[in-house]
A protein has these predicted regions:
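Conserved S-adenosyl-L-methionine
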Residues: 181-192
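Class I SAM-dependent methyltransferase SAM/SAH-binding core
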Residues: 55, 61-103
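A short acidic, Gly/Pro-enriched loop at the edge of an enzyme's catalytic core
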Residues: 102-114
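A short glycine-rich, Lys/Arg-flanked "PGG" loop and its adjoining helix->strand segment in the class I
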Residues: 129-141
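Conserved class I S-adenosyl-L-methionine
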Residues: 2-49
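Core SAM-dependent methyltransferase catalytic element
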Residues: 191-210
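Acceptor-substrate binding/catalytic loop of class I
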Residues: 155-171
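Conserved beta-strand signature within the Rossmann-like core of class I S-adenosyl-L-methionine
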Residues: 142-149
């Protein structure tokens, strides 16, 4: 089923309103989440000379911006939630852009790496090819995209007050390859648990060149 422009605007507005209303609780609830495995997965595949220019896509309150900055890199944050943008700026001292995922305005070939941790699943399936293309264009040639999302059976819709699209590996792989990325690795999280207890699908991709 195709989503019309008004429906897409409503999806963004209502999902972002949820995060706006719960920003403080979200910050406290995720403050101590260990995503070091994900950060390492992005950084080890970047072949540029450090410090790396990084985009934290869906940076939330700025936890991972702080980590990238502490590692000596040059991160920029992006989020569609005004409260998160302000929190991230204050917490990290980094540049943070307020942008809706469905209305991006990204510089071309700016970043060595893009870190999309728990963010791209909010993009409706029909819009993903366009959004992935915009992320690809924002990477330098050979740049790296990391993505981690709740996995599923390719259904999408409302999960309480948030909209989400939940892909399995094969479908996600097809989407990324069609958008001009080549696979580097993928894994399930949290590490060390049986697959049925690993709700997160993480993957790393390089911008493919013609």
């Amino acid at each position: 089923m195709s989503l019309d422009d008004q429906t897409l605007r409503d999806i963004s507005r209502l999902t972002l309103q949820h995060y706006q209303d719960s920003a403080e609780a979200f910050r406290e609830g995720t403050r101590n989440h260990d995503v070091s495995q994900n950060i390492a997965a992005l950084l080890r595949h970047i072949h540029s000379e450090p410090p790396f220019a990084l985009l934290d896509f869906g940076c939330g309150p700025g936890r991972d911006l702080n980590t990238f900055k502490a590692l000596g890199h040059a991160p920029v944050g992006l989020d569609g939630c005004p409260n998160f943008v302000e929190m991230a700026r204050q917490a990290s001292g980094c540049e943070v852009w307020l942008q809706d995922f469905l209305a991006l305005d990204l510089p071309a070939a700016r970043f060595d790496g893009i870190y999309a941790n728990a963010s791209l699943f909010h993009v409706p399936r029909q819009e993903l090819p366009r959004v992935l293309g915009e992320l690809r264009a924002a990477l330098k040639p050979g740049g790296v995209l990391f993505a981690s999302n709740p996995r599923g059976d390719n259904a999408e819709g409302w999960n309480g007050p948030r909209y989400g699209a939940y892909h399995d590996w094969e479908h996600w792989k097809q989407l990324l390859e069609a958008a001009g990325f080549e696979q580097l690795e993928h894994y399930y999280r949290p590490a060390g648990l049986p697959r049925e207890q690993q709700p997160w699908l993480a993957s790393v991709w390089r911008r493919a060149e013609p």
